[in-house]
Every structure is written in structure tokens, then in C-alpha cells.
Amino acid sequence: MRQPIRLLVVSVRFLLVAASGILASLPAFSESLEHCFVGNYHLEDRSDVDISPSVDGTLRWRKFDGTTGALHPQANGTWTSTRGWTKAADGMVVSFAGCDGNAIRFGGIAGTRTDFDVHEITFESHGTRLVGRLVLPRGEAKVPIVVLVHGSEHDSALTSYSLQRMLPAQGIGAFVYDKRGTGKSGGTYTQDYSLLAYDAVAAATTTRSFAGARLGSIGFQGGSQAGWVVPLAASRTAVDFAIVGFGLAVNAIDEDQQSVELQLSEKGYSRGEIRDALKVARAAEKVIASGFSNGFAELDRLRSRYSGARWYKDLRGDYTYLILPRSEAELRIMAPEFDWHTPWNYDPMPVLRSSRTPQLWILGGEDYDAPSRETRKRLQSLIAEGRDYTVAYYKNAEHGITLFEVDATGERISTRYAPGYFQLIRDFALHGTVSGQYGDAELTRPLRHD
């Protein structure tokens, strides 16, 4: 089983599964534990560890070097850790000083929770009340501030986004908000990129107003679906930088096509077999893009033709696999719960070509949910044309820029974030550029930096 919740990550595929009820079955995190222990702690070895709420009564720790694990409560009041999103114990024991304290002992190293200047803020966008939080390092100095933009997740960013603390611990402010239809915000959940971009612009405007004299520079950061939203938002308001993780420079139909191709090619199927699989996927994509209103005859014809093919059992894509086993009647019933106004054929390239905002894109070579090959190629072509883009490519990273193991059943299990991932975000927010080495990331920088 791959990791259930990632930092700022929920792909279209994961989002569709969630809407089918899987996420709804996860128990809510204990409010008391969240209140007591969530925070960013500075340790005596001069590193920081962030503690965030998770599922099934657990906590999640993250360090800036990319290591992470789940914390499980024990009867003696301590917490034991399992590595990444695996079930393997990593030997880490953690204890807290109780609900009235700010102390932690993390793997034998003492630490203290870091205090930030925190402002809870309500603002409006297109008639919808949104709830946000501005988190700043303590002091009076000007700081860059990152507006954290959602992926496609349904959960509350105010609760789940650990960057709202990890960045301030590095001297960078963060504005986090629950997008419409999630958490404490009003409105209806949507995947309308344009509307979400206007919400992000409203968040940036609110940030400028509340940060006042402390605002140095300002920019957007987001992952996955935010790869479509962030550049749109940056085209509508003046910002100093934009950071996209595991996003796409193609549309959502191409996303599924490329996912099918990557998955089947890695399983060793021939080019001819993959071409046939892509035909089936294209028929499924047409059904979902139509709002489950047409395309069923072609889908049925191709399913009947290829259901006996050896590759059919491995045909998944980003969302094709949800369509394949269901009848027309079942799919039509599903239509209302997927009525999210998703612009399936949205072309992001005109916005990317016209951008004058320095942008950092962080991509994973093993990303099944948002395959990066064509996106990387397109971004590199923009760099060759003189655009101000930086691409950091982690060959072995999957969606979320996490590394993984493969278990005996062939399932990926995420183990940690790629080394250098969080440092990339920090340095680009601080300087509008990156320099040096970030783990094994392959960097393509704008021509002006060469």
C-alpha cells in the first residue's frame, strides 16, 4: 500500500478514490492530541522536526532533510516510529512533555517547540468565505512569504499542511488556507482551475494586507493539481516567484494517457500492446470528460475487444481503472459525485509561455500520477527560449517527490522525501533561484544563470 496522505499531494487518481468513500472511512484525528503536540520543534542537534496530525490515531514527523515516519502511541506515554509510510519500525522513540509543555525528546535528543507569530484570518473570494492562517517567524524583519496553494485534496490545509511551520522555521513566512468546500472554508468543492486561481490571488492579496511591513517578497507554492492553478494565479497578480511540485504542463487527459504508457512500459509490454491499451484508456477518458453522459458505446466495444488481452489486468492510468469495471448504468449514477467542473482539456502552455514570474518546477521520474517526461521536455523548451524557469528532476522519485520500495505484491511503499526537496523550496523562496546540489536532483536553470 502506498502512502495514504502526502504533504500537499493528492492526485486526480487518489482524489477519485477518496470520493468513492475510502477516505471517508478513515477515523478523524484526535483533537486533543492535535492541540497538544502538533508543531515544529528545534532540537539540541540544531535540526528541526515537524509533528503533524495523521490518521488512525497517529502523528507524522518530518525533518527538513526529507526523512519522515509515523508515530504510534504506546501505553507508557511514549510514541514509537515506523519508517516513511511503511510498517517497519525504525527504532525511533519520541516523547512529549504533556499538553501544557513545549518540550520533545526525539530519538534521545531534547528539543523545544518553536513559537511563531500566527494570525487566523477570514477573507472572501468570488462571494465565498475562506479561512486562512498567516504564520511568520518571530521578530520584525522582512521575510519572504509563500502562499500555499492546494492540490486536489478534500482535506483541510489548515490541519494537514506541515509547510506552514517548516518554512517559518527556516525564516520564511507561510499563508495557508482551506480552499472552498474544504475544512473551515465555505463554498462548494471544485476543480475549476480558473476559480481556484482567483482564490489563490485573493489569498495573496490578504497576505500582503496582513503582513504589512514584514513582507519582503511573495510567491505561490503548490503540488500536483496546483501545477495548473499556480501559474494561472501568478499570471493574475504580481508575485516574485512560483514553485510547483509534481505538476503538469499537459492537460488532464494527457496525464492519464502518459500514466498508462509509463506503467505498462515499466511492466515490459510491447509498443503495440501499449497502443491498444491507450485506445481503451482514451475511450474511458472521453466518458469521464463528458460528465458520464456519452461515449459508452465505444468504451463497451473496446472493453469487449481487449478484455482478454494479457495487459488488460494491468491497465490503470490515473483514473481509467475506475471506469473500466463499471457498466454504463453504474457510471451514470457516479456522475453527480464527480461534478467538480474539471477542465479536462485545459492547455497550460499559453500561460506558461507568457509568464514573467521566476518559476521552480520539481519533478519525479517515477511519478505514475503525474508522469513528468513530456512536462520536463516542455519546460526545458521554455528555458531554451529564454524563459525564467528552473527544473529540478529526481529520477527515482514518485508523486510527492518521495522515494519508495516495492513490496512482494508489486505495490510501492514510500519511505521518505527525496534529499534536497525541502531545501529547493526554501532556497527558491529566499533567493528566486537555486544553487549547489540538492540530493541527486538534475537541475536545468534559466539561461541567465548559466
State where each predicted segment sits.
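Conserved alpha/beta-hydrolase "acid-adjacent" motif
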Residues: 368-374
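N-terminal cap/lid segment of alpha/beta-hydrolase-fold proteins
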Residues: 105-139
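Short beta-strand element of the alpha/beta-hydrolase
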Residues: 142-151
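The serine-hydrolase catalytic nucleophile loop
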Residues: 153-165, 179, 373
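Accessory cap/linker subdomain of secreted extracellular hydrolases
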Residues: 245-351
